[in-house]
């Protein structure tokens, strides 16, 4: 198990908040973001943990840090997230309600004249 800390970081993007997970040697091993939107909404954005540091509680620590920050500073706002199947149970435990299902689609862009 790796010792790590979570710090809040400043971003250059307006209304974007982020947290970084660092090892005790200050190696970045994870991050999580959120964006404050119009109409008192907060979009929970991407979270990432380096492959070699997964399954050590880093994602949960990042998520809980962001959650505590939101509860302290954004009472009355509505938080939402586009969730992968692996995170749905955590969101349910936090009281999130399921919305519509969304399907990921992709296409390689080609200059077809």
Positions of PLM-derived features:
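Conserved N-terminal entry element of GNAT/NAT acetyltransferase domains
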Residues: 1-10, 111-113
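Conserved acetyl-CoA-binding loop-helix of GNAT-fold acetyltransferases
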Residues: 55-68
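Conserved GNAT acetyl-CoA-binding A-motif
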Residues: 70-84
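Conserved active-site alpha-helix within GNAT-family acetyltransferase domains
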Residues: 83-103
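Conserved beta-hairpin
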Residues: 14-30
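Conserved GNAT-family N-acetyltransferase fold
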Residues: 19, 30-32, 42, 47
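Short, low-complexity Ser/Thr-rich regulatory SLiMs
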Residues: 34-38, 51
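A short, internal acetyl-CoA/4′-phosphopantetheine-binding micro-motif in the GNAT/acyltransferase core
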Residues: 46-55
């Amino acid at each position: 198990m790796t010792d790590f800390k979570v710090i809040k970081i400043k971003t250059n993007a307006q209304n974007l908040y982020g947290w970084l997970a660092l090892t005790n040697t200050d190696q970045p091993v994870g991050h999580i973001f959120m964006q404050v939107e119009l109409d008192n909404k907060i979009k929970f954005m991407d979270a990432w943990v380096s492959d070699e540091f997964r399954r050590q509680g880093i994602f949960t620590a990042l998520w809980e840090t962001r959650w505590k920050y939101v509860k302290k500073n954004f009472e009355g706002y509505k938080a939402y997230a586009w969730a992968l199947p692996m995170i749905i149970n955590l969101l349910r435990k936090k009281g999130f309600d399921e919305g519509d299902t969304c399907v990921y689609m992709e296409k390689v862009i080609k200059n077809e004249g």
